[in-house]
Structures are given as C-alpha cells and as structure tokens.
Amino acid sequence: MIEEAEKYLGMPYVWGGSSPSTSFDCSGFVCWVINNCGNGWSVGRTTANGLRGKCSYISPADAQPGDLIFFEKTYNTTGASHVGIYVGDGMMIHCGDPISYTSINSNYWKSHFLGFGRIN
C-alpha cells in the first residue's frame, strides 16, 4: 500500500480529486491507493468519515504501516475530516499540498488526532 502511495508524492491537493489525472484530495488519495495497491480491497470513492466506517478501531500502540489515521476538525464538518496512511515511526503519507510524508507528532496533527483504523 505504501509503495502505491509513494507513486503520487509531490502531486498537488485538488478538492474533490480522486485519480492521478485530476490529482487528489485526502480521501480521494487514500481511496485510490487502497483500490489500486493490489491487496484485493475495494472501498470505492468515499469521504474520510466514510473510510473510517470501513475500518476497525486500532489503538495507537497497535498501529502498523498501512493502517489509516484519522483527524477531526481540520475544517468545519463532523466526524473524520482528514485521513492519511500511517507509515510507521510517527509518520504518515497524506494529501496535504502536496502529497507528502508528514510527522503525526506536530502540535497541529496531535490536536486534531481522532484515531487509527484498519480496513475490514
């Protein structure tokens, strides 16, 4: 999954984007990676909160590379408002602007942390 995600490093954030031809928003990026990583998963195209509903809760201590990481209140919506792919060692790959590796231990991400999830 991480190998698929790395193909898109540096691509810009585009609201509503869901494929390499349009670029991505956060959930479009994660959905594309899940659907195209070769693990046989299919989540369609959904929101960060929709992806959260397709996952089992994982404690931070049990999070593994490839699990999803969810954040809330990154903009005015209820539930999960941002999603990334946990890569281990306190890092995620996500569609910020651009798609990049980011520490989940910054004050910003720690203040918005909602939880980890593993695709069912």
Stretches found by the model and what they are:
Residues 11-65, 111:
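Catalytic cysteine-centered active-site loop
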Residues 22, 95, 101, 107-109:
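Flexible domain-boundary/linker segments
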Residues 39-102:
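...with weaker cross-activation on analogous glycine-rich loops/strands in unrelated enzymes
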Residues 17, 73-75, 120:
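Short, well-ordered turn and helix-capping elements at secondary-structure junctions
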